[in-house]
Amino acid sequence: MLEEALEHLVKGIVDNPDDVQVASRNLRRGRVLEVRVHPDDLGKVIGRNGRTARALRTVVGAIGGRGVRVDLVDVDHVR
């Protein structure tokens, strides 16, 4: 449910919604939602001074609780 909600929010922000991917990983300290977008859209998802990314984290945290973390993955720099 969280993955779908986050994916829906991010798709509304970006210019290339077909390239949005949200993956979930469970760790000892909670859950991590990794967001991957088209490289041209990364700046939009981060926002000025990180405001958009912070807002996304706040919304997901309100829905999922404290054990959920949202990470934005830069696909240009992944090995």
From Swiss-Prot:
Supply the alphabetized keyword list. Cytoplasm, RNA-binding
Q: Which GO terms describe its cellular component?
A: cytoplasm; nucleoid
Location, primary (coarse class): cytoplasm
Q: Does the keyword RNA-binding apply?
A: yes
Where's it found, cell-wise?
Cytoplasm; Cytoplasm, Nucleoid
| Gene3D superfamilies xrefs | 3.30.300.20
Q: Extract one GO molecular function annotation from the record.
A: RNA binding
- Domain KH per the UniProt entry, residue ranges: 30-79
What's a Pfam family this protein contains?
Answer: KH_KhpA-B
Q: Which InterPro entries match?
A: KH_dom-like_a/b, KH_sf_prok-type, KhpA
Family stated for the protein in its record: Belongs to the KhpA RNA-binding protein family.
PANTHER family hit by this protein: RNA-BINDING PROTEIN KHPA (PTHR34654:SF1), UPF0109 PROTEIN SCO5592 (PTHR34654)
Function field? A probable RNA-binding protein.
Q: What is this protein called?
A: RNA-binding protein KhpA
Q: What is the lineage of its organism?
A: Bacteria, Bacillati, Actinomycetota, Actinomycetes, Kitasatosporales
